[in-house]
């Protein structure tokens, strides 16, 4: 009898433990994984918007610190008495453990990861409109191609991940050469994105026009392709065919944009390209990362805002924000020339 009771108690304990295991394995109800997402047209657009959201830091870490501060456009004051990332980068003293390098790397690979998920999921999602499906897919291709282009431009050889992978899989991915990534990933992705609609024909998941929402369109794809070809035409690639390809793309951009309407006959008109209109978008913008009013904002503003938005005298050396980053004097001289 005692043995039978022990068997019953043991069986009850096993059932209880199994039940607890099942309970602990219950998926969280407040989060949707990629396997449960990308089921509908609306969810697919949310995923695409999530990729654009990954770009929040691009203007700051990518284009300001990692690009302009290292260029001939800006002069960065050496600061031997204090650590300032912009100073270390701008004077080419930065070491490989600098946080800005890591932040930039992670930002672009987050774009790539999310784009890979979208590209793998959208084809099997339920869509009411095939044209909208193709638009969303081509936006993902544009963003992935752009991300790899910037990684190559900054870091050279990098790992090329073209599908969703587990962490263990990614560890086994070796670096690809920069020219291989440009020719076999960046250009093919951007060529696919050339099938995007023109700005006026871009739609959201509900079919509404989104021509002023800052999303990549056909013109953005052509202009980005031109950037890639111009990069290939120069050092260290020296591709002899790339210059003519860039010229063709830029001619297409000018032809499609009715270039005659974009001429600025006066300084006031020229300044409009830097000043937001009521709708934020302006005719001089091909593609720009936009920040929602009332959102978290553009972090670069606090690092690059001139003391005077419209300087009265271009011959002065204007300090950007509180950082020791200045407009390069020879560039300012060009604005003083008649």
Task: List the model feature ranges, each with a label.
Residues 1-8:
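Bacterial N-terminal signal peptides that target proteins for export
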Residues 129-136, 143, 210, 217, ...:
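Structural signature of alpha-solenoid helical repeat junctions
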Residues 17-19:
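C-terminal motif of bacterial Sec signal peptides marking the signal peptidase cleavage site
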Residues 3, 164, 291-293:
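Short, flexible loop/turn elements at secondary-structure junctions
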Residues 21-83, 190-194, 215-338:
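An aromatic- and glycine-enriched ligand-binding surface/loop that stacks and positions planar moieties
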Residues 119, 151, 159-161, 285-289:
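Structural recognition of the beta-strand scaffold that forms the well-ordered cores
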Residues 40, 45-59, 81-155, 171-184, ...:
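Conserved, well-structured interaction surfaces
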Residues 157-179, 184, 236-244:
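Short coil/linker segments at helix-helix boundaries
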